[in-house]
Amino acid sequence: MAKIYYVGDWAAMLGPVFAETPFNYTVKGTEIFNYGKWLKDAIESSGRHEVTSVPTWDFYRLPPGGLEEVLEAYDVVVFSDVESKNFQLAPAFFDRTKFGRQPLTFPDRVRLCVEAVHRGTHLMFMGGWLSFNGELGKGGWGRTQLKEILPVECLQFEDLRESTEGFAGQATRPDHPLFRGIDLTTLPPILGYNVVRPREGCDVLATWTGTADPMFATGQFGRGRVLAYTSDPAPHWGCNFVFWDHYARLWVNAVDWLVGG
């Protein structure tokens, strides 16, 4: 059984906000959404794998040594809509009570992930507004050392391509184990994706129809395998995708391939 640590695809809705007077307002209600439940359920559907799904803010608040423990304990780590600031900043940097007492530093999460992949941890990078380079460049993956273990090259500017009519995909490597039992021609409309470029030495398994833009790409870095999917495995881009008949099988295939050696 593979153990998967899945970061991202959670959201909190705060409000609505009621302004009762010019000097008083109240936030009424808090609702937490786990948009990652579809991917978690899909991967676990075979009964062979176990997924721990955590919000991005839990990843951000891991204490020193916390990510090291995760990378040691889990076979696969998934990042979906996790902008680079969550790797590069730490809560202590904004705690004024700690200022001036001693130099504030934190273990480099990017470096830890890169080193873990070379030792044999496997990664999945998923698309979204805060993935790859992302909306207004907020994703920022390509501006970090993560680019060393990405099987695609990020653009240097906003990379979102969206359509209310959606996009289709086509397999360029239909014989790859990812597509075992999968017919990509039945894929429902995908409402957006991150535009990236193929990376030399890595494999593009599928492209977005009518383009050369990678949809699925893979790479081997040291002992670890990495899979990139350039759209979102969850709503909103994936609001049709999660109800596709082949959705669960696709992600089971993905994990099986990653850990298959």
PLM feature spans:
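An acidic, glycine-rich "communication" segment
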Residues: 1-2, 9-19, 118, 122-210
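Helical hinge/lid and interdomain linker segments adjacent to catalytic or ligand-binding clefts
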Residues: 22-137
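Catalytic cores of nucleotide-enabled group-transfer and carboxylate-activating enzymes in metabolic
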Residues: 45-48, 192, 223
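Active-site-proximal beta-strand/loop segments in catalytic clefts of secreted hydrolases
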Residues: 7-10, 56, 79-83, 126-129, ...
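Extracytoplasmic/secreted proteins, especially bacterial periplasmic and envelope-associated proteins
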Residues: 34, 38, 108, 112, ...
